[in-house]
Amino acid sequence: MRIGPVELSAVKDWDPAPGVLVSWHPTPASCAKALAAPVSAVPPSYVQARQIRSFSEQAARGLDHSRLLIASVEVFGHCDLRAMTYVINAHLRRHDTYRSWFELRDTDHIVRHSIADPADIEFVPTTHGEMTSADLRQHIVATPDSLHWDCFSFGVIQRADSFTFYASIDHLHADGQFVGVGLMEFQSMYTALIMGEPPIGLSEAGSYVDFCVRQHEYTSALTVDSPEVRAWIDFAEINNGTFPEFPLPLGDPSVRCGGDLLSMMLMDEQQTQRFESACMAANARFIGGMLACIAIAIHELTGADTYFGITPKDIRTPADLMTQGWFTGQIPVTVPVAGLSFNEIARIAQTSFDTGADLAKVPFERVVELSPSLRRPQPLFSLVNFFDAQVGPLSAVTKLFEGLNVGTYSDGRVTYPLSTMVGRFDETAASVLFPDNPVARESVTAYLRAIRSVCMRIANGGTAERVGNVVALSPGRRNNIERMTWRSCRAGDFIDICNLKVANVTVDREA
């Protein structure tokens, strides 16, 4: 799937041309300093703790776990290894997330070890010689796992007149922001040095450790009666006490398999434009319309009259804009569909997304701590990501990368969530990361085809068509949905679930 100049795919589908590999890893002295680093009082962020627990739980079952964010960019010329060594070390010392590693003492006790002096981090280049595409991929995904300090590595693949720069970083220390801000940081520092200029002055990097402190201060003040916590509890209780599962079969989770990514074009440029016009006419944005299409598609595949989804949100503050780390929260989305038109469903979906945005600051694991009858998210919970390159901040990133060949890749291991990624540039496409087995592949193929079918119907004018009421809600389930949806609405919004009507839903189109 391509979003403007950025290619998103599985690493097995990445075919870098053969070349001489030079990779950067820590010196023995740096590794020794890291291992000797004292325990810090700062806990991991909630999303870091989830990653460490899920990695360890999957490993205990003999299963592999997706963990790496891999990004690459093509560069003309020969790499200046001395300059690149400076840039890599400057990056690692600039961002304090790289000074930490984590020790899992038990499921509920994860401790952070912190390197006190950034100068103790030193990466040096190693030349490996000519490698094939397959050998290159194997080397890159062999970056140490989440329980090692050095769970990040960098490298270049040198060819006759160009090279590929790559970063392979455990998600503990990076999110999708790295593909934009992180790569541009490398590019700007490297360009200045090879042009004979002194190292450039970068804006303040901020501190991911400070974010972890702020997050735990905020969550410690929450109680079971906090409105945000109550909203999460309402959502979870209707989904068996946790995050919603993907509604189609995914095969036997106890059988070891890799992960794969399946992509499908949903709409061409003209259809995408018509679809967005339909969303605007429904008083929704593109994301609300896509959530509506996913909800309708799931209804057509399973008969489910209400869609429950989770979508991630970057929770950086303006001060965190340049900060390297994992700043992802989740928004719960509830979208009833039975008996409604697309216009009504899209408005409800948009309202659910907008009013739930503040819940992204409340990690679900904290909600479980406050309400122990709930359960932490299980493997392969359903997650939907949206990447809209027509609006900020992604639109600015795509302009910066014009003319460059940039890629980001899944590492070929099984993801913890089953992740659907919808990307729009001129066209609209979707990709799904899933367990690589025949049952899951069949389900994901049917799922993508159903979403495409719904999107095309809407783009071709089918907004007034009402969704058939395939499955009736039980009275108790209906009351839970009504209670949860009312709780999530802003003042001035009105969703009459009993009569399945929508009125007075205002949308900020610039949000």
Swiss-Prot record:
Keywords: Acyltransferase, Cell wall biogenesis/degradation, Lipid biosynthesis, Lipid metabolism, Transferase. It catalyses: a (hydroxy)phthioceranyl-[(hydroxy)phthioceranic acid synthase] + 2'-palmitoyl/stearoyl-2-O-sulfo-alpha,alpha-trehalose = a 3'-(hydroxy)phthioceranyl-2'-palmitoyl/stearoyl-2-O-sulfo-alpha,alpha-trehalose + holo-[(hydroxy)phthioceranic acid synthase]. Gene3D superfamilies: Chloramphenicol acetyltransferase-like domain, Nonribosomal peptide synthetase, condensation domain. Disulfide bonds: none annotated. Its EC number is 2.3.1.283. It comes from the Bacteria. GO terms for molecular function: acyltransferase activity, transferring groups other than amino-acyl groups. Disruption phenotype: Null mutant does not produce SL-1. Disruption of the gene does not alter the virulence of M.tuberculosis in mice. This is 2'-acyl-2-O-sulfo-trehalose (hydroxy)phthioceranyltransferase PapA1. It comes from Mycobacterium tuberculosis (strain ATCC 25618 / H37Rv).
